[in-house]
């Protein structure tokens, strides 16, 4: 690929380089970088640039291609993708999973795929890189808006996340477009796999027989928005996710300060979250105990000492968004997940 690639390859390479450098600066050099590789344009562009960038840092790349066993020929396709990754310089793995969980084939396949990637990451001792792009972010924001969501949900896909098992999930291409990943593949002469399950008329359907919701948003809602607004809505939707992430972080910081009893820090955080505050009437109507019961129901627990330990006057006087987060944080510190 060379030290100074051009065009779409350059855009992908710079994004991956910045992400991996940031990870190494914070966590140190890992044993390997694990890349989820379906063979589609996004994951293929990620893999080829990650292999190049990681090799310069002396770190192996392990690609994981998951065969869900849901299509005729999927096992052969997974092997072809793994063979390509091996030729590109990765240590290529294929994993066959069983898709039989609740929530339909799409959700079950996603959970099985995540579990497989997590297992490899824990074994290899490195983070997982995923090929989500700005379009994926925009689609997620729209899907969550349709459910009626607040900032915790509308922050959508996190560029970096550490899960409860200690695995770090990185999405270096979240600021790039699908045109960038497709262009990168074309530049380096790679032909991506076309997955028919992603098509609006693909074999996987929603429970009512209609297209899968994400496919409907991708091929229906976003083009319709572009036509109606006379503009590409994807960057604005992605920006909404970033703004909600900043708001959610501020509210969560305030809530944690309340739980820790750091009243002065909480007061200093008030300005950052003032736009989310309830009016006095709203505060009066909702008691801390009622909200604690709601949060307890969400996590499948009883209201106990974890709620009683809160400084009630401080928490009741906070905006609702902060109260909810304070209660969740108290539950977490009380050992409830």
Which residues make up each language-model segment?
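Core alpha/beta nucleotide-donor-binding catalytic domains of modification enzymes
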Residues: 1-219
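AMP-forming adenylation/ATP pyrophosphatase catalytic core
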Residues: 3-4, 11-42, 62, 68, ...
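Generic alpha-helical structural element
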Residues: 5, 130, 206, 210, ...
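Short helix-capping/linker segments at secondary-structure and domain boundaries
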Residues: 57, 227-232, 331-337
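Electropositive, surface-exposed helix/loop patches at the edges of structured domains
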Residues: 126-137, 231-250
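Short, well-ordered alpha-helical segments in soluble proteins
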Residues: 145, 149, 161, 189-192, ...
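Mid-to-C-terminal catalytic subdomains of enzymes
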Residues: 184, 188-242, 269-277, 281, ...
């Amino acid at each position: 690929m060379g030290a100074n690639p051009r065009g779409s390859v350059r855009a992908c390479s710079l994004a991956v380089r910045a992400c991996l450098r940031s990870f190494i600066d914070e966590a140190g050099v890992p044993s390997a970088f694990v890349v989820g590789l379906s063979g589609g344009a996004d994951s293929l562009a990620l893999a080829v640039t990650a292999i190049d960038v990681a090799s310069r840092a002396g770190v192996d790349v392990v690609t994981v291609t998951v065969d869900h066993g849901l299509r005729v020929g999927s096992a052969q396709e997974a092997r072809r993708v793994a063979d390509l990754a091996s030729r590109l310089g990765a240590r290529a793995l294929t994993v066959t999973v069983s898709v039989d969980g609740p929530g339909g084939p799409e959700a079950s396949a996603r959970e099985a795929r995540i579990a497989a990637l997590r297992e490899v990451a824990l074994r290899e001792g490195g983070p997982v890189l995923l090929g989500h792009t700005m379009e994926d972010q925009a689609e997620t924001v729209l899907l969550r808006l349709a459910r009626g969501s607040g900032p915790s949900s509308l922050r959508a896909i996190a560029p970096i996340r550490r899960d409860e098992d200690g695995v770090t999930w990185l999405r270096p291409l979240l600021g790039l477009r699908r045109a960038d990943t497709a262009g990168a593949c074309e530049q380096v002469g790679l032909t991506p796999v076309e997955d028919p399950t992603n098509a609006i008329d693909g074999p996987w359907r929603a429970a009512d027989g209609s297209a899968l919701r994400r496919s409907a948003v991708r091929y229906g809602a976003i083009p319709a928005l572009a036509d109606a607004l006379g503009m590409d809505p994807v960057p604005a939707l992605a920006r909404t996710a970033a703004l909600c992430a900043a708001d959610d972080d501020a509210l969560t910081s305030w809530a944690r300060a309340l739980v820790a009893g750091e009243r002065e820090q909480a007061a200093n955080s008030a300005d950052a979250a003032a736009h989310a505050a309830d009016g006095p009437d709203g505060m009066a109507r909702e008691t801390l105990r009622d909200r604690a019961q709601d949060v307890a129901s969400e996590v499948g627990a009883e209201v106990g000492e974890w709620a009683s330990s809160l400084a009630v006057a401080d928490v009741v006087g906070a905006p609702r968004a902060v109260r909810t987060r304070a209660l969740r944080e108290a539950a977490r510190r009380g050992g409830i997940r």
